[in-house]
Amino acid sequence: MNSIYEKLTEIPVFKGATREFIHSFAEKTPLTFSKFGAGERIARAGDVCRTVKCVLSGRVRARRRVWGGRLYVSETIAPEAVLAFDRLFGLDNRFGAHYTALDVCGTMEFSKRVFIQLLQDNQVVMVNYMNLLSRMSQKSAEAMAENSWLTAGQRLRALVELATHRGCDDITIESSGEALTELFGPDSAELFARLDMSGIARLVSETELWVATRSGLLDYND
């Protein structure tokens, strides 16, 4: 129980919850634990998100399509992440990415009904979830498209913040054929050069950008 407790305290939805509450949750809630071997698919883009699915161990690789298929964003997700947390409810409740185990990976999941009860019973859980939704809603959906009034740095940071999980690394942004400098604007070539010199990102080819860590890029001030 102690190991499960420690893992649960690191999951975003339980941040700040008391030991007693988490122990009670772990003991009384029907939880499903699964293991996936390297290369196994955990969830597919387009699948209905029916449960709260948490990564407890191992690394997960996610790949999603954005900008109407003109770009693909991939990332490596560490343990304690919740997959598709923003897709549990609403008009679009399908996974927005393919999730594949990079190595042996353990997950825990529980039903939406249980999660709704958690929101009603525990204010900390409710605030954690509301904060996550608020952060996402405050980022304009327009930032996910091409906008002449945004700099290349603003577009790139908005894209990574909205299309990846917190704490992820090894991010790749690939176009379906167009040069990234054309997609991100005339000032992007200079931006990519500065990011390369800083060790934050590297332009692998005209159509692929590698980013070391999400936090490193979001903290970069151009």
Please provide the spans of the model-predicted regions.
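Cyclic nucleotide-binding regulatory domains
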Residues: 40-102
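Phosphate-/nucleic-acid-contacting segments
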Residues: 150-152, 159-222
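Residues that scaffold the ATP/ADP-binding catalytic core of kinase and kinase-like folds
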Residues: 63, 85-86, 117-118, 219-220
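Amphipathic, well-packed alpha-helical segments that form the structural scaffold of globular domains
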Residues: 26, 134, 138, 157-161
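A small-molecule sensor/coupling module
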Residues: 94-98, 113-151
